[in-house]
């Protein structure tokens, strides 16, 4: 049996990767990937943090951010679930738009100039399947492209191009990204490996780190057990850094009793404890409200109202805690859902899968206010009418990458595959990153010059091999191998080759080096000459 199969089939991952913080267990993604071999795959040096909140199921943005200026159109389209105009929460300096009455926390953040509402975010030719639409948002792809990498994973691979070789190191001793949840997110998938780790189900702390172990027998099964123990040992070393950071925060502000709040409390604790982790992902489910979205007697309460209460109170508590922990200058957050809901409600007091919906950007360094206009709605909306998108969701991504993480225009095109408009949603003065430190950290095994390059350029690929079979592949944005410039036996040393890029379309590519157990992927960008 192969080691990866033994690992996968012998005991649950949660049993291999022990608990570390607030009763949540930790595991690395991709049990059979190179990430597993390096397991100490941490990472970061910047002080800027992005917290991504996924609202699973397709949130009804029209009942969350309510168009007061077109209240009659809104009410007529959904008379059985519409929020009474008198109960809509007002926003300072804006008489056109309001919030669901259960979102007093978000109202406070808006009035305190710590919230930006981006109206009608979507993309062309929207998909209404939960799974496919989620993949589109996670990958940052066009609706007709099946991209196998995530937008944050590609970003992290450009920011930390040597990862995971030579990690952890003094520049970035911590995870690049942390997701709270048991399912690995496509958003964190890099060109070759997942760039994050997850904190998952509640269990005991470090049950493997300090446990007493019997000697390993000198048998094939014993050798596999030794391999598992070695992986567990490396994982515990990595988890130890997280536990140390969490242990430095002994007091936090109050949080409400809901699952999203529990996740955000962990995030605040880890940031406050000094982790340099760049991106955190959390999620909250239940937003697929086809029926019983509201109570018949009172549309301000019901299933959707409960969800919005949990989101609002959790985010407000998180921001209060960030201020208390003196980390609010470092943190911004965003919400997204795989799609919105239809303009017109259905006969079951619910809403069906729709297109565009608003996003929340929150934090001390977001530009406060409302980006865009209230969504346009036809006078007599029918069951097939959708809210048209005003902003492509990748414009929001691009704005965060450019203005919060200081990503260059060339790297933006590599990450998002094309240019998208920059929105005034982040304070420009926030961009103070240390990109050279990040990009020089770790061991550089492969590089290209020039990069970006044109059809007429002579591209040189330099690489280091420890000897033996060495493979270099050039992969396009869809994950297809389009060139194999190196596939041969080499002796230990440094080498240079000329890469023939003739005939390749303009766009983002990745050069992947594989040499034994070593693997490294670097982004490439071909531009029009």
Where are these regions (language model features)?
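Feature for exported/extracytoplasmic and membrane-associated proteins, marking the mature portion
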Residues: 1-313, 317-325, 344, 358-431
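Active-site lining segments that contact anionic ligands and/or coordinate catalytic metals
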Residues: 277-279, 328, 336, 354-357, ...
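Conserved hydrophobic/aromatic pocket- or pore-lining residues that grip, position, or stack substrates
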Residues: 282, 338, 451
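Hydrophobic alpha-helical bundle architecture
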Residues: 321-329, 333-352, 360
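Low-complexity, Pro/Thr/Ser/Gly/Ala-rich linker/spacer regions in secreted
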Residues: 428-442
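C-terminal outer-membrane/trafficking sorting elements
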Residues: 440-449, 454-529
């Amino acid at each position: 049996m192969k080691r990866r199969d033994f690992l996968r089939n012998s005991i649950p991952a949660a049993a291999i990767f022990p608990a570390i913080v607030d009763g949540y267990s930790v595991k690395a993604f991709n049990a059979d990937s190179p990430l597993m071999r390096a397991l100490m795959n941490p990472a970061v040096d910047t002080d800027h943090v992005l917290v991504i909140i996924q609202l699973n199921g397709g949130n009804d943005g029209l009942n969350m951010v309510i168009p007061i200026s077109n209240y009659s159109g809104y009410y007529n389209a959904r008379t059985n679930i519409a929020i009474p105009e008198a109960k809509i929460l007002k926003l300072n300096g804006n008489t056109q738009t309001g919030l669901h009455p259960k979102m007093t926390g978000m109202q406070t953040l808006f009035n305190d100039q710590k919230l930006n509402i981006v109206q009608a975010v979507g993309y062309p030719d929207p998909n209404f399947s939960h799974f496919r639409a989620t993949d589109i948002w996670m990958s940052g792809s066009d609706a007709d492209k099946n991209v196998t990498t995530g937008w944050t994973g590609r970003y992290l691979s450009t920011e930390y191009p040597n990862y995971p070789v030579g990690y952890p190191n003094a520049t970035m001793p911590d995870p690049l990204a942390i997701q709270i949840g048991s399912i690995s997110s496509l958003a964190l998938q890099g060109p070759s490996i997942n760039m994050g780790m997850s904190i998952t189900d509640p269990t005991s702390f470090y049950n493997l780190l300090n446990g007493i172990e019997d000697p390993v027998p000198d048998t094939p099964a014993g050798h596999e057990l030794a391999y598992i123990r070695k992986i567990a040992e490396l994982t515990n070393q990595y988890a130890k850094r997280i536990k140390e950071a969490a242990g430095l925060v002994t007091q936090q502000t109050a949080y409400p009793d809901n699952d999203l709040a529990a996740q955000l409390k962990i995030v605040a604790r880890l940031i406050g404890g000094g982790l340099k982790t760049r991106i955190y992902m959390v999620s909250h489910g239940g937003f697929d409200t086809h029926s019983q979205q509201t109570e018949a007697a009172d549309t301000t309460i019901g299933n959707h109202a409960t969800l919005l209460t949990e989101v609002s109170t959790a985010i407000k508590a998180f921001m209060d805690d960030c201020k208390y922990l003196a980390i609010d200058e470092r943190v911004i957050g965003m919400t997204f859902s795989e799609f919105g809901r239809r303009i017109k409600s259905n006969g079951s007091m619910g809403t069906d899968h729709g297109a565009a919906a608003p996003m929340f950007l929150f934090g001390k360094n977001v530009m406060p206010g409302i980006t865009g206009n209230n969504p346009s709605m036809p006078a007599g909306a029918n069951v097939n009418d959708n809210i048209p998108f005003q902003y492509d969701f990748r414009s929001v991504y691009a704005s965060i990458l450019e203005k919060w993480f200081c990503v260059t225009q060339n790297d933006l095109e590599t990450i998002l595959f094309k240019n998208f408009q920059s929105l005034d949603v982040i304070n420009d003065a926030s961009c103070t990153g240390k990109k050279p430190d990040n990009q020089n950290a770790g061991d550089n095994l492969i590089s290209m010059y020039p990069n970006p390059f044109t059809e007429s350029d002579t591209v040189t690929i330099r690489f280091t091999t420890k000897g033996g079979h060495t493979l270099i592949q050039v992969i396009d944005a869809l994950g297809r191998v389009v060139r194999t410039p190196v596939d041969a036996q080499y002796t230990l040393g440094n080498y240079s080759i000329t890469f023939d890029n003739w005939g390749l379309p303009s766009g983002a590519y990745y050069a992947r080096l594989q040499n034994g157990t070593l693997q490294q992927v670097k982004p490439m960008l071909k531009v029009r000459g």
